[in-house]
């Protein structure tokens, strides 16, 4: 993921065809080490492809995953958890705000604000 992020930053920054050295420089600038074999494999797979096409392809794959998932049986449990969380919220003591004289830190007169 770090390689793809660095590649995308370079493309969005105006470098239409980032090299392995370009990606390494970006990663090194934020203190991340890179593995040459993984970087070479990524650049080989991305060769000749536009970033916006890759993003569209990835988005369609992600949306197909969420569309195929059916509802889980966790809806009833979520309702029970909400009741428990509500009970916890009621138990918290509320703190009152105190009028505190801040020692006239803004240089005004001695009146209370």
Swiss-Prot record:
Residues 60-113 are annotated as: Disordered. Residues 88-99 have a biased composition (Acidic residues). Phosphorylated. InterPro entries: P1/P2_N_sf, Ribosomal_P1/P2, Ribosomal_P2. Pfam families: Ribosomal_60s. One of its GO terms (biological process) is cytoplasmic translational elongation. It comes from the Eukaryota. Belongs to the eukaryotic ribosomal protein P1/P2 family. P1 and P2 exist as dimers at the large ribosomal subunit. This is Large ribosomal subunit protein P2.
